[in-house]
UniProtKB/Swiss-Prot annotation:
Pore-forming protein that forms cations-selective hydrophilic pores of around 1 nm and causes cytolysis. Pore formation is a multi-step process that involves specific recognition of membrane sphingomyelin (but neither cholesterol nor phosphatidylcholine) using aromatic rich region and adjacent phosphocholine (POC) binding site, firm binding to the membrane (mainly driven by hydrophobic interactions) accompanied by the transfer of the N-terminal region to the lipid-water interface and finally pore formation after oligomerization of monomers. It holds the Pfam family Anemone_cytotox. Residues 22-45 form a propeptide. GO terms for cellular component: extracellular region; nematocyst; other organism cell membrane; pore complex. Keywords: Cleavage on pair of basic residues, Cytolysis, Ion transport, Membrane, Nematocyst, Secreted, Signal, Target cell membrane, Target membrane, Toxin, Transmembrane, Transport. This is DELTA-alicitoxin-Pse1b. One of its GO terms (biological process) is monoatomic cation transport. It is found in: Secreted; Nematocyst; Target cell membrane. Residues 58-77 are annotated as: N-terminal region. Octamer or nonamer in membranes. Monomer in the soluble state. GO terms for molecular function: channel activity; toxin activity.
């Protein structure tokens, strides 16, 4: 009996610290997972600031931002990343997007305050279809007028090339086929690969913008006070 008590004492002396040590390790592991999750949350917040459908500080808008969000679309033959910087002194509220061809996987950012920039993407329709990413988006400005941005990334570069355009319409006007046709055919559409500057003729605003010429297109536009 005496030997059994000694044995039991030695067994407990060895087992209890080990048990506590194991428990301590598990606790550390749990904390590490929590920290990892917190970091993932922080990364998600940082990521959300540079994904399509988001609004970022206007000063952050650059082609490298558009390259990043374009990559997120994946391997699609015709796609475009659009960034529009609001330096108009006005607040913009989204109206809608009209597509001549293609679609988008994100929602047009609803509100764009002054000194902010919206990020948006479009792509050709999924599947083996000979279509491009072509359309126009519209925002109502706090002046009461509408800002329209046309973009065209065609499928057939033997017949067409990338084009873009911007116009301010009187009053509230949703994007539709008529608006698209006017901006594409009758309002001096802008060619890619060179910086364009143009007075917009209303609300004392002008534009400065650039579009790349390939099928993975990037379009950056700054709307500024004249």
């Amino acid at each position: 009996m005496r030997h059994f008590v000694v044995f039991l004492y030695m067994f407990l002396a060895l087992s209890i610290p080990t048990a506590f040590a194991k428990k301590h390790i598990v606790t550390k592991k749990g904390n590490h997972q929590d920290i990892t999750n917190d970091n993932e949350g922080e990364n998600a917040e940082k990521k959300s600031a540079t994904v399509a459908g988001a609004v970022i500080a206007g000063g952050e808008l650059a082609l490298k931002i558009l390259t990043k969000i374009l990559y997120e679309i994946g391997k699609i033959d015709r796609k475009i990343a659009i960034g529009v910087d609001n330096e108009s002194g006005l607040k913009w509220t989204a109206l809608n997007t009209y597509y001549k061809s293609g679609a988008s996987d994100v929602t047009l950012p609803y509100e764009v305050e002054n000194s902010k920039a919206l990020l948006y993407t479009a792509r050709k329709s999924k599947g083996p279809v000979a279509r491009g990413a072509v359309g126009v988006l519209a925002y109502k400005m706090s002046s009461g007028n509408t800002l329209a941005v046309m973009f065209s990334v065609p499928f057939d570069y033997n017949l067409y090339s990338n084009w873009w355009n911007v116009k301010i319409y009187d009053g509230e006007k949703k994007a539709d086929e008529k608006m698209y046709n006017e901006l594409y055919n009758n309002n001096n559409p802008i060619k890619p690969s060179t910086w364009e500057k143009r007075d917009l003729g209303k609300d004392g605003l002008k534009l400065r913008g650039f579009m790349t010429s390939n099928g993975d297109a990037k379009l950056v536009i700054h709307i500024e006070k004249s």
